[in-house]
Amino acid sequence: MIGSAQSVSVMTRAQLQSFHLRRYTPERMVVAAAGNVDHDGLVALVREHFGSRLVRGRRPVAPRKGTGRVNGSPRLTLVSRDAEQTHVSLGIRTPGRGWEHRWALSVLHTALGGGLSSRLFQEVRETRGLAYSVYSALDLFADSGALSVYAACLPERFADVMRVTADVLESVARDGITEAECGIAKGSLRGGLVLGLEDSSSRMSRLGRSELNYGKHRSIEHTLRQIEQVTVEEVNAVARHLLSRRYGAAVLGPHGSKRSLPQQLRAMVG
């Protein structure tokens, strides 16, 4: 649920209904189906249930293009809470899903923190046992995106977690990943993509997202070729371009002030 307790509590049924009628309209929607589906029967059902709201020949609104906006400079946010763990999230802005190096960015994310063989998992958890959880995430939208790193650890290990995390990010920004890491990351991306297609719901979601995001169907073969074409040189160029920037950060845990947070974290935010 997005919003504060106050904003949610004053929300009315009429407001929700008005929002639904204005936003959930045929020109904003795609109906996708996968499995043993009769196409003509599906079209008939859509016409039956949407009826007069359908506009003949009108396609969904074209995906938005342009450069995303970020309000203000990267900042550090602290939520002081009496908790057993410290949670930290670091993030940097990236280009959107239409970027020409989009798949190199996905390979970078996977090699950095996208699995058990990733650099962060190996250095922070496997080798040193500093954190319960550590991983990266990549969110791509029409006009911008975000590459983030999350970790959860005991408060007394927070400084060590940030020291190792900062070292990993600086190392990848400076020296890049290895050919072997690139190959493992590409294999992980390909494997996850193909395994996901074994589920009809995933196939359906992929069809709908492709139509909404790109205005056309992108085959699995097309995506696999794009991943395969990524080189370690391209990945490392993306790493130099993005990972040398200042980060935004959010911390939740038993910490009284920003001054009490690890110096490595404050230096990364700048």
Model-inferred region functions:
Residues M1-P60, L78, P95, A104, ...:
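Charge-rich, well-structured scaffold segments of protease-associated domains
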